[in-house]
């Protein structure tokens, strides 16, 4: 019987440089898609995928994230007094989503360094990782799709999608075994962090969803700092590949990189179009203003 994945890690200590000056005082993870912070979408995806415990890795300037997932008795009591019962339930439900823990990453030395901060939380259990910049809208949560692949293979699994071959230098790219065009589950031979288009072995990009084993921690302590002078998770995964099988799950869904200006705006428009409180006519009027 395969062990259920109960724990997930969400790295959220980044500086949000691409969204400055908005992120000077506000964590980028707290910037909203319409009226809900982006990190709440990530947490909700984890919960819908069966995750019970979540560790969010933050920096010293990210206390707003802690506050968001905590109870706010003053606000809740005020809503009750004003008979705003629906709003009260919505606020209370946020604090009850899951068992959420926090740890500070003292220096932002890369994704691999952030993952190392989760070692004591994870213990000897296999676990999931969700990156906060990658918001995915799909009927079946992207992480759940990756977990299904993990349960099928009992191997470390990464979520991928095909990207424009001209843009592979923005992502971690996998080297697949054989033809991958008509497959959803693909064996991984290697991974390369932000390769030049001419050097990429595929256009399958690693897009912020992982199911990992505790062996990743030893691997990350065994590899040198890589691209950008940071400890890269991709390098740790390649170290594991020497002794373990890896699979990539080509997940379905509409994915946005909300850590970029264009991705953040597109995600807001997509969310608005699917929000019951906002008519499509209103969104189209906004687009017409832009055209004018």
UniProtKB/Swiss-Prot annotation:
Keywords: Nucleotidyltransferase, Transferase. The gene is galU. This is UTP--glucose-1-phosphate uridylyltransferase. The keyword 4Fe-4S does not apply. GO terms for biological process: biosynthetic process; UDP-alpha-D-glucose metabolic process. Its EC number is 2.7.7.9. GO terms for molecular function: UTP:glucose-1-phosphate uridylyltransferase activity. May play a role in stationary phase survival.
């Amino acid at each position: 019987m395969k062990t259920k994945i109960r724990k997930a890690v969400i790295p959220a200590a980044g500086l949000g440089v691409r969204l400055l000056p908005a992120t000077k005082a506000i964590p980028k993870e707290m910037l909203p898609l319409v009226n809900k912070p982006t990190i709440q979408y990530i947490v909700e995806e984890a919960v819908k995928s069966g995750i019970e415990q979540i560790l969010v890795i933050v920096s010293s300037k990210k206390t707003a994230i802690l506050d968001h997932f905590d109870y706010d008795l003053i606000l809740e009591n005020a809503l009750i007094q004003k008979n705003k019962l629906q709003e009260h339930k919505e606020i209370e439900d946020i604090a009850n989503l899951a068992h959420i823990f926090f740890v500070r990453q003292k220096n932002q030395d890369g994704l691999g360094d952030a993952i190392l901060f989760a070692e004591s939380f994870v213990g000897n259990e296999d676990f999931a990782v969700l990156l906060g910049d990658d918001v995915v809208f799909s009927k079946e949560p992207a992480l759940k799709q990756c977990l299904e692949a993990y349960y099928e293979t009992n191997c470390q699994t990464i979520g991928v999608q095909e990207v424009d071959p001209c843009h592979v230098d923005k992502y971690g790219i996998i080297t697949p075994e054989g033809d991958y065009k008509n497959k959803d589950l693909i064996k991984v031979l290697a991974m390369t962090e932000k390769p030049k288009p001419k050097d990429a072995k595929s256009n399958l990009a690693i897009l912020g969803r992982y199911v990992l084993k505790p062996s990743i921690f030893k691997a990350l302590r065994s590899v040198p700092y890589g691209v950008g002078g940071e400890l890269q998770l991709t390098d740790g995964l390649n170290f594991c590949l020497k002794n373990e099988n890896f699979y990539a799950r080509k997940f379905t869904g509409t994915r946005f990189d909300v850590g970029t200006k264009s991705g953040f705006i597109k995600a807001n428009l997509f969310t608005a179009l699917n929000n019951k409180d906002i008519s499509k006519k209103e969104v189209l009027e906004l687009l017409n203003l832009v055209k004018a």
